[in-house]
Amino acid sequence: MITIVVIPTERFPWTDTNLLNSIDYRLNNIPKSNQRFAVYAPAWLRLQLEEAAVSLTPSQLLAAIQDIHVPVTSTFALLPKAKRFAQWLLDDPSSNIWHIPVTVLNVTATSKHPTSDIFNYVVGHVSPNAELATTASRVSGTQVVYTRTSKVLGAPLRLAAPTSYYSGYLSSQQLSHVYPSSWTPETFKKKEICFTILPSLTSPKTFLLDVDAPRDPSFPLSVMWPLLRNDAVKSHRLMPPNALLRRTVDPALKPEWSADVDPSFRALRLSRPRGANTSSCHNRHHVPVCDIQCALTPEPLNDSEKPPATHITIHAVPSDLLTVLDITVGKEYPLRLESGMYVPWMLMSLLMSDDVTLTGTRRSVKLETAHAAQRPFTQVKILRCVSARVTSVRAGPATYLNAVCLTLPKGSFKSTMIDTLPSLFPEWPVVSTTAIVDSDHLGDSLDPTFEQRFATMLETLPPGTVDQAIRVALATCPTADETALQLIVTSFNELYASCMTEAQRNRVPILTQQGRTLVFAHSDYEMLAANVPIQVIRGAIPIDHTVNIIARPNRVGGTALQLLLDYCYRMQASPIATMPAGALYRQLFGPWLRAKADCEQLTPVSLIAEVPARVMRAAGWTIQDDMPLIINVMRCYRNVDDQIDDVLTRTETSRAIITISADGIILVEYAPPLPLITLPSSILLPATYTATWLEPPRILLTGSNVSVTSGLSWAEVGSPLDVPPPGV
């Protein structure tokens, strides 16, 4: 077994116990990876290492654990206090493996002030004041190490006696970190390669994975990285990631060769790599992401001055986005269009991310994409991509198949995102525009529009009210009277309730039942007030949306009205915490970026429902022949090389409640709701889709409304789609 030490990189998801995600996403995609890889990073080990890193220097900690090897087979057994220890052995004589005389036990158990002399019979136990290095040194030679201190290092800690004998000794919080006396370690099965967070390089065939990325600052052992890497270089125990990938993923990779890594190459037997493994089915549940470190350069004041760059890190950007857009690391690009706004590829990187921070810090920043700053950034250079990892996109944030609502303030590039991102897939029907509902669509459908009514309402207010309200909303005058702004917010809420809430309620079926729908809104109140049964996600983006509103003066009512509208919508919103809108964008478009980057050839596979012809005829419809009519509930796609026989023979547990109106609109409701996580992992789901008849529909004349319940199954329809190579 080859052991590879991994010090997690920045933003490593500790909730995911699979360390493969922090190395390279391809390790997760090879067949039977769980049979080839083992991960040794138990919770007790991380907790002990974190506590030891506080009291020991990096060099002391490395020295303390140098003789501990993976897997750890020893355990620490925590003894009770002297009086309770004696009482335990009296109550359970079979536990007296030290043959302590009964007279000694009785004296200790009945004494008001017992001494610790009874522990002299426990030969080799760890004393209460023992150093952590001392506790670690006991691990390698003994199966069970008895200890009188809970501060140990190198093996899991369990109770030596039942929990009742520790009353008054350990608090409930301390007990939560100690295993019960009946606990036994899980059997560790050795595999071809074992990944671990135990930073010990003394065992044979143990190497340090040399990932070029910042360490996770929340992991205390990150401070050990320079020292640990220096030791690995001296002992020739560095493991380059490309060497690991060549051995396990693709023998065609050309790793760099140097004397420092000769032992790792020999250990992996790179001269005789295995044949490349290809999975029998693509997994659409996971999307690889990385953190992009960029340098933003402002306009120079003169020709001789070279202004300093601002370094930022864009977190959790889909790795395939840069591949599809043909963006090169290390190359400098213009940041803005002639209009002054950011170039589309940079906007998409920001909108699909989780956060933007100043590189080297945890300070989040919001970028001003409009050309509004005193010295705006004009050039961008991607320095490197770090912290590659895999995120699951089927489990959330959208949970069910039918519809989801994303709330974003004005100026959040909702229309830009929906127009620009699907254009990357000209050959693929990724988005059905009829299944996207814009945040302003409802207000614009009124006559006069909602924004026009709001402008009329502002005109009825006393002179100066709007100006004073804007100063307060923009916080340019902290001491200003907020009465004017409160008046506008109250009037806005009354206006909204009088005309928008009922209109929103009337279009509930269109929002929630026409297929897989993406609904945009300004606030979650818009859905909650109208009782719309839809999952609502309060989104946030790493962009200053207020500056974008100011940079768009041609909207209804001008900048002033738009700023007040934005403020009123934000005051309507609930106090629920926001989440990155990029998480939803990655869920919808991330698997398609992966397919585009790999130049996959796709073929349609549809989720279908059947409507009996006799039911349609009973409602006055004229139908050709007696075969059931097929509804394409959702047209998905799969790779032509995937084997999906199990998909075509499965029936979903949910049933479709189908309503067909006289004007041909098809509404589908799932009972129970259909979770995305239960759908086949090899299927590419469209970002949005509207249910349609499967051609040919065979409907000659329409009739009255029809409602029917149908099962859901999968069928292959249509012809394969060839995918153009990636690039702008």
UniProtKB/Swiss-Prot annotation:
The keyword Nucleotidyltransferase does not apply. It is found in: Virion; Host cytoplasm, Host cytoskeleton. GO terms for cellular component: host cell cytoplasm; host cytoskeleton; viral outer capsid. Pfam families: Reovirus_Mu2. The keyword Acetylation does not apply. It comes from the Viruses. InterPro entries: Reovirus_Mu2 (IPR012494). One of its GO terms (molecular function) is structural molecule activity. Keywords: Capsid protein, Host cytoplasm, Host cytoskeleton, Outer capsid protein, Virion. Minor inner capsid component. Displays NTPase and RNA 5'-triphosphatase (RTPase) activities. May function as a cofactor of polymerase. Associates with microtubules and plays a role in the formation, structural organization and morphology of viral inclusions, where the assembly of cores and the replication of viral RNA occur. Belongs to the reoviridae microtubule-associated protein family. This is Microtubule-associated protein VP5. It comes from Aquareovirus G (isolate American grass carp/USA/PB01-155/-).
